[in-house]
Amino acid sequence: MWIQVRTIDGSQTRTIEDVSRKATIEELRERVWALFDVRPECQRLFYRGKQLENGYTLFDYDVGLNDIIQLLVRPDSSLPSTSKQNDAQVKPSSHNPPKVKKTARGGSSSQPSTSARTCLIDPGFGLYKVNELVDARDVGLGAWFEAHIHSVTRASDGHSRGKTPLKNGSSYKRTNGNVNHNSKENTNKLDNVPSTSNSDSVAADEDVIYHIEYDEYPESGILEMNVKDLRPRARTILKWNELNVGDVVMVNYNVENPGKRGFWYDAEITTLKTISRTKKEVRVKVFLGGSEGTLNDCRVMSVDEIFKIEKPGAHPISFADGKFLRKNDPECDLCGGDPDKTCHMCSCHKCGEKRDPNMQLLCDECNMAYHIYCLSPPLDKVPEEEYWYCPSCKTDSSEVVKAGERLKLSKKKAKMPSASTESRRDWGRGMACVGRTKECTIVPSNHYGPIPGIPVGSTWRFRVQVSEAGVHRPHVGGIHGRSNDGAYSLVLAGGFEDEVDRGDEFTYTGSGGKNLAGNKRIGAPSADQTLTNMNRALALNCDAPLDDKIGAESRNWRAGKPVRVIRSFKGRKISKYAPEEGNRYDGIYKVVKYWPEISSSHGFLVWRYLLRRDDVEPAPWTSEGIERSRRLCLRLQYPAGYPSEKEGKKTKGQSKKQGSEATKRPASDDECPGDSKVLKASDSTDAVEAFQLTPQQQRLIREDCQNQKLWDEVLASLVEGPNFLKKLEQSFMCVCCQELVYQPVTTECFHNVCKDCLQRSFKAQVFSCPACRHDLGQNYVMVLNETLQTLLDLFFPGYSKGR
C-alpha cells in the first residue's frame, strides 16, 4: 500500500511506498522525517479533519490506499510544553447578550404604555407631531408600514438631505412578516408641551429628522426618517363605487407570491371589472419605489381593502383615536398569526404556547424557539453563552475527538478477527485489505454478461481494481454470485493443481472445504465440499435441473447463464493461458456440466465445473485478440498514484526474465501465440480502433433532435474506441444523482434529468432546471425522452435493471 503526504500549503507532495495499514503513527513520522526533513516533534499530521496521535495505527484512522495526509510544520519556538497548551480553547466572550425570542406583535416591558402615547405633542417645528400615527415607507421594499412619531429633531450637518439614513449607521432588512434590524433606542427627552398643528411648514420640513417606531415591529427600535418617506396614517377604505381608473391608492400585494397576502404598496388602478354581484376584479400598476420600478398588470386579491392615500397636512391622529392597523402577510402560514392558537413552528416548539416570549430561546441551528422551562432538564434562567442549540441539534461533546485526545472505541473494529488475534503477522501490506476507492455503478452488482466499456483483454494489476471496474466484485473470493440466483463472475487463479485449462474450455473447482477460521485467507483442504453457497450459485448457471448428488450436464450449454471469467497471473503455474502479470478479463463462459469427484491432490471430495467460452470478441491469446488489444491500446492498468519507479522496475525485471527464458528453450508450436503479452502505451503505434455504431443506434441518434448538440460532441470521440462510452456516460449524467440518466426528461433548456430526480425537486417546491436554474414553472409537464432511454439501453445493456 502507498499513501501521499502533502504540506498544509500544498507546495510539496511525497508518496510513501510500501506502508502497512498496521503501521503506527510513530513509524509514519519517521518516514515523513526522511522525506521532508521535519523532525517528529515538529510534525502535526491531519487526515479527514483528525489530528493523528501517537499510539495508534493507520488502520485506526481508516487511512486507505493513495489517501492524502496533510503535514503542518510546527515551529520550534511554539513546541507545546504541556498537554494543556495543546488543548487550549478560545472561550467566547461572556458579555454577549443571550438570544431571546421576540414576537413581532408582542409588547415589551420597556415600551411606554398606550395611554402615555395618546397625547399629541407639538415639538415647535416640523410637519408631524410626537405620538402621531403615520405610514413609513421601507426604502428597500417600497412598502408602507404603520408607525408613530417617537421624537422630532433638527437635521445636523452630518445628515444628507433627501436620504433616510438609519440611526448610528445601522442597516435593516425586512421580508414578508419578519424584520431584521440592529439599532439602539433613542434617548432624547420630549418637551411635554402641547401645541397646535403646524401643517403649513412643509418648505422648512426638509431639515427635520423624524424618529419613528414601527407599531408591528417594535424590535426594529427607533429609526430616523425623512419627511418624503412619511405621510399621515391611512384610515379610509374606498368602496367599489369610489374607485376610478387612474386613481393612485394603497393596496395589499405580495411580490414573491401574488396569490397570498403581502405588504402595502402605492398603486395606480388600471382595470376595474365586475364579474358578478359578489366577485370583482381590480388590476393595478404597483410602485415599488427607488430603482425597483413598477410591476404592471397586478391583480389585487383584497378588493375590499383598498385605502385612500392621506395627503400631508391631514388631521393628525394618535392611539387615542384607535390603532388603525392593516392586515399584513401572517408571520406563520401554519397558524395564520393567530395569537390565541397554539403553534409549534412560530412559538415554543415543545408546548406551542404563545406566552412568555422573553423566556424563549432560539436554536442557532434549526431556528426553533423553546421555553426554558419546557426543556429537559428545564433551565432556571436564560443562559449567558453566545450560541445555544436545542436538544435535537446539539452535538454530544463526548463523541467529538479534539486535537490531542484519544480516539473513541469502535464497536465494529472491536468485533473484527484482527482485534482479538495474537498473531504478529503484518496483514496491512496486502492490497486485498485496502478497500475500494470507487465503485462501478453503471450496472448493478447482480448483472449478467459483459460490463459496458470493458473490452476482452483488459488487464489490471491488482484484484481490487477488478472489483472497482465491476468485472468481479469480491476482493478475495473466487466466485461472485448468489445461491438463489446464480454466479456472475469467477477468477481462475490455479488454486488446485489438478485443474485443466485449455483456453476456450477449462475445469474449475468449487469453493469450501478449507479451514479459514480467524483472519486466514488461504488454508489446506480439510473437509469435503458441498453444493451450497457459491458452489450452488455456479451450478445454477448450467442449463439443467439442479442436482446436489451426482451433478448435471446442460441440455444446451449456450442457453445457460453467462459468467465473466478473469484469469489471474497466479494461474500461470498450471496454465499457459494465464497472464504473466495482473488480472485479465477473458470474456463470457457458460457452464457445460458439473459433478462431484475425489481430488487427486488431497483426497477430499470437490465439485468440478466444465466451462466453455461463448463470446463474440476474440480471446486475448489468439492472433485476432492480440491484434485487437493492440488496436484498442489495452495495457496493464495500475491504480491511481501507483509509484512509477515500481512500475519501471517490474517492466525491467520482466524483460530480463523473458530474455533468459528465450535462451533456455525455443517456443514450441503448441504454445499460445504471444503468450498473453501485456501491451504498454509505447507498444501502440497505430490509431486506436474506432467504436462502431449499429444501424439502429445511428437511426435513434438522428431521431433524438433535442440532444443533437450533445450527440455531436459525443460522436466526435468515436475514434477513441472504448473511451467513447466513458464520454457518453459523462455527457448524459444526471446533475442530481450523478449517475447515468434513467428515464430521462429533456427540459426546454436542453438538459437531461432523471424523471424521479426532477419529481423530487418539484416536491421540494423547486420548479427550476437543476442544471441551469431555468424556470420550468409549477405546471411543467415531464415528458419522458423514450428515444434517449432506448439508446442508453443499447449502449449500456442492463444499467436500468438496478435503478
UniProtKB/Swiss-Prot annotation:
Traits of the deletion mutant: Deletion mice are viable, fertile, and grossly normal. However, adult mice develop frequent spontaneous seizures and display abnormal electrical activities in brain. In addition, they display reduced 5-hydroxymethylcytosine (5hmC) in genomic DNA in the brain together with impaired spatial memory acquisition and retention.
Record region (Required for interaction with histone H3): 118-312
Record-linked Pfam families: PHD, SAD_SRA, TTD, ubiquitin
Positions carrying Phosphoserine: S668
InterPro entries xrefs: PHD_UHRF2, PUA-like_sf, RING-HC_UHRF2, SRA-YDG_sf, SRA_YDG, TTD_dom, Tudor_UHRF2_rpt1, Ubiquitin-like_dom
Region of interest: Methyl-CpG binding and interaction with HDAC1: 415-645
Single GO MF descriptor: ubiquitin protein ligase activity
GO BP: any one term: cell differentiation
Domain YDG: 449-613
Coiled coil start-end: none
Catalytic EC class: transferase
Compartment(s) where it occurs, according to its Swiss-Prot or TrEMBL record: Nucleus; Chromosome
Tissue expression from the record: Mostly detected in several tissues, including the thymus, spleen, lung, adrenal gland, and ovary. In addition, found in several tissues in the brain (cerebellum, hippocampus, and cerebral cortex).
Expression triggers: Up-regulated during cell differentiation.
The protein's assembly and partners: Homodimer; disulfide-linked. Binds methylated CpG containing oligonucleotides. Interacts with H3; the interaction has a preference for the 'Lys-9' trimethylated form of H3 (H3K9me3). Interacts with PCNP. Interacts with HDAC1. Interacts directly with CCNE1; the interaction ubiquitinates CCNE1 and appears independent of CCNE1 phosphorylation. Interacts with CCND1; the interaction ubiquitinates CCND1 and appears independent of CCND1 phosphorylation. Interacts with p53/TP53 and RB1. Interacts with UBE2I. Interacts with ZNF618. Interacts with UHRF1. Interacts with FANCD2. Interacts with ATR.
Record's function text: E3 ubiquitin ligase that plays important roles in DNA methylation, histone modifications, cell cycle and DNA repair. Acts as a specific reader for 5-hydroxymethylcytosine (5hmC) and thereby recruits various substrates to these sites to ubiquitinate them. This activity also allows the maintenance of 5mC levels at specific genomic loci and regulates neuron-related gene expression. Participates in cell cycle regulation by ubiquitinating cyclins CCND1 and CCNE1 and thus inducing G1 arrest. Also ubiquitinates PCNP leading to its degradation by the proteasome.
Protein name: E3 ubiquitin-protein ligase UHRF2
Species in which this protein is naturally found: Mus musculus
